[in-house]
């Protein structure tokens, strides 16, 4: 009797399984993506369904995602554009379902990517090929050291792989343009053109680095760096630059005009002055999240008298003393970590400013277009370079310390504007200056990039007199020269 009861139960179970299998074999609109080799009773989560199953360019697509885990802060990215779900999960048989709707790009990628936990840095959930096997586009471009700050997305790079410098703020992480979402779009566009992207990370507008002594600000800044380094959408970033001009009063507005000290910068960058076992510093956090991205020291402003350094350079000028003290701090910190068995705590390179001074009296009648190749030692500054060749002063300091000797240098701000003199490039740019500057830098193997400030910033007009795109006044000559240097 008991045997027959179990047999009947077994037959009912078999019937249920057959009906369930038949249900899944019925034709449905769209298609389920099946991972080869996965057992049918052990799905590879998430399961993705498309409608239509093989969409054509320009078609609107519905995409459903089914998973057993309630992932937060999910996104769908198509050709660099992020989409939020149009329908959120409702529990059905212990599974959760999201739905997106998007248009297949007429041109561009045929792969879409799903992410989760984007509030902490987007983590890949699933990649979906819209048609066939996805192959990364081949970008065959000739490298150049030439680059720009704030690239015009419509710029023709003439088949060259140049440089782009961008900017984001830790305290504006959720804001338009300066925050994470718009930054990821710009990085995607630049990478699609074969460009190398350097992202400068500031604490806040008017406050380049966390104010001296403010550990809460340090925690916030480091959390933002972790988020950027973790975000899969930013894997194409070549390097992160930590701050800029922090030795000047106007870059320390939240600190009552007190500039960041070399020691404080070292604390934020690599934990200088703290126990060697502590990991709450920029370089160790970024390396833990993304070992391949470079971590660069932000530029010291040349010719600023706002801050000095305790370790005097051979040329006793405040900005050079500051730089010498800063590099010394970073070298000391890296050596202390190495001694404790913690490698890779030295920076990967330095961003520097190198502006030209085409009206310098030291030119003494020589052509202003030749200024980048001419030494302009200024007597009142004890022989410090007064023009573009200040980059040589920076190199001398960087190469004087064991852990930084020979590291790459990136000129992330170059033009013919001198702070304090107030003459914009639209009024003083000498024809041929940029050509000469690139010729000089092409002969410097340690200098990897020469970036003009700026290309385009359409959100206000304050930089129009510097812009290659706006072409105000003499900037028309500079813009034509930039294009010619890239090639036909």
Regions found by a protein language model. Give the residues of each.
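Aromatic-rich peripheral "rim/lid" segments of glycoside hydrolase catalytic domains that contact
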Residues: 136-137, 143, 147, 155-158, ...
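Short, compositionally biased P/S/T/A/G/V-rich stretches that sit at domain boundaries
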Residues: 31-61
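Edge beta-strands of extracellular beta-sandwich domains
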Residues: 121-133
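N-terminal substrate-binding region of glycoside hydrolase catalytic domains
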Residues: 132-264, 297-303, 310-318, 373, ...
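Noncatalytic carbohydrate-binding groove/subsite architecture in carbohydrate-active enzymes
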Residues: 195, 200-201, 218-222, 262-428, ...
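Surface-exposed, short loops/turns at beta-strand junctions within beta-sandwich domains
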Residues: 103-109
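Aromatic sugar-binding surface patches on proteins
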Residues: 91-101
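Short proline/glycine-enriched turn/loop motifs at strand-loop junctions of beta-rich domains
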Residues: 67-73
């Amino acid at each position: 009797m008991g045997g027959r009861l179990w047999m009947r139960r077994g037959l009912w179970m078999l019937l249920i399984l057959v009906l369930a299998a038949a249900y899944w074999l019925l034709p449905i609109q769209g298609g389920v993506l099946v991972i080869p080799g996965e057992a049918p009773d052990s799905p590879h989560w998430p399961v993705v369904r498309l409608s239509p199953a093989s969409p054509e360019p320009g078609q609107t697509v519905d995409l459903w995602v089914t998973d057993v885990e309630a992932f937060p802060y999910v996104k769908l990215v198509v050709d660099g554009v992020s989409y939020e779900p149009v329908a959120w999960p409702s529990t059905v048989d212990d599974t959760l379902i999201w739905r997106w709707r998007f248009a297949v790009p007429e041109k561009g990628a045929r792969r879409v990517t799903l992410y989760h936990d984007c509030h902490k840095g987007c983590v890949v959930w699933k990649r979906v090929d819209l048609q066939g096997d996805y192959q990364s586009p081949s970008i065959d471009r000739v490298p150049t050291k030439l680059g720009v700050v704030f690239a015009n997305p419509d710029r023709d790079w003439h088949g060259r792989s140049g440089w782009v410098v961008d900017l984001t703020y830790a305290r504006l992480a959720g804001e338009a343009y300066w925050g994470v979402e718009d930054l990821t779009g710009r990085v995607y566009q630049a990478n699609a053109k074969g460009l190398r992207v350097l992202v400068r990370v500031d604490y806040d507008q008017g406050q380049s680095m966390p104010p001296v002594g403010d550990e809460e600000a340090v925690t916030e800044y480091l959390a933002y760096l972790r988020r950027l380094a973790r975000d899969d959408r930013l894997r194409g970033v070549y390097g992160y630059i930590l701050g800029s001009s922090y030795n000047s009063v106007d870059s320390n507005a939240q600190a009552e005009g007190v500039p960041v000290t070399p020691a404080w910068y070292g604390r934020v960058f690599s934990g200088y002055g703290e126990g060697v076992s502590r990991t709450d510093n920029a370089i160790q956090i970024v390396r833990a999240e993304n070992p391949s991205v470079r971590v660069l020291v932000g530029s010291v402003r040349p010719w600023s008298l706002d801050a000095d350094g305790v370790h005097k350079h051979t040329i006793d000028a405040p900005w050079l003393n500051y730089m010498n003290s800063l590099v010394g701090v970073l070298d000391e910190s890296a050596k202390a970590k190495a001694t404790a068995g913690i490698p890779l705590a030295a920076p990967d390179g330095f961003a520097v400013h190198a502006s030209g001074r085409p009206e310098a009296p030291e030119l003494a009648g020589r052509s202003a277009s030749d200024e980048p190749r001419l030494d302009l030692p200024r007597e009142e500054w004890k022989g410090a370079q007064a023009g573009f060749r200040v980059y040589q002063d920076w190199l001398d300091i960087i190469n004087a310390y064991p852990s930084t000797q020979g590291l790459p240098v990136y000129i992330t701000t170059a033009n013919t504007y001198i702070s304090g003199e107030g003459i914009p490039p639209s009024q003083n740019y000498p024809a041929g200056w940029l050509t000469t500057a690139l010729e000089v830098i092409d002969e410097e193997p340690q200098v990897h990039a020469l970036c003009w400030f700026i290309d385009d910033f359409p959100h206000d007009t304050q930089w129009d007199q510097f812009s290659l795109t706006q072409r105000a006044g003499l900037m028309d000559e500079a813009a034509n020269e930039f294009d010619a240097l890239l090639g036909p």
